[in-house]
């Protein structure tokens, strides 16, 4: 197939143009707005088929990890192609495998942060001066939203413990990343995902990050057996390692909240290897290595 999604940097408008084109091409796809960012940018979601339950793929929580949006859209495109035409992906007949089920994609959870990481101060509006100072002029490593809150530390999962660990690591104020804010769900991007999960019957989630080729699975005592079983399958189909987060990386995350709130499986997948931000030119290479895992994750 001729790929619409390329291995190149995509701004907010580019991402939405790709989503609109895909939804126009494939009748099985439907775009809807999950919420809005601090700057008022739409946090768009795409539904592939209506079902009794859904698998949710969410990408680009962190600005410097905007490549995960490319990977997410590459997978969405191929999955829709196979579903629409009764075809297979990684040897699996997608329409048959998803009978009674659907998949929801959120390719860019943090559109403001991605714009800052890609385009610098011009994307930061009235906060341009403050953000320039916070990141020392190197915008490419910006992970937070427009207010300097790390979205993946802003969910209501052991938030008190997260704040304690932040303090131990000297993280006290808003900045380019790792600060979870003063309270959970203080940010509209966080609220958008929480609302989406509460509205739809999400069976399990895959939070897409970079880097390390690692799968973080489960959270505390919740859904341990099912989580572990699924994690082993995802690892076997990708070659990625299984691990658990430590320090200020533990708690406050989307996967942590989903698993603890619903007692259902959730995974944080760190795609690719290297140092963030990964070279967007490698998006297709990273996607192809992970495609079997993503396909299996969609249908488990």
Question: Where in the sequence are the language-model features?
Answer:
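C-terminal accessory segments enriched in acidic
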Residues: 1-18, 25, 159-300
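A domain-start/cap signature at the N-terminus of enzymes
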Residues: 21-32
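Surface-exposed patches in mature extracellular/periplasmic domains of secreted proteins
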Residues: 31-34, 86-94, 243-247
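Short beta-strand-to-loop junctions in surface cap/lid or active-site-entrance loops
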Residues: 45-52
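Active-site/substrate-binding loop(s) of hydrolase catalytic cores
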Residues: 52, 66-67, 74, 80-219, ...
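Short beta-strand element of the alpha/beta-hydrolase
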Residues: 54-62
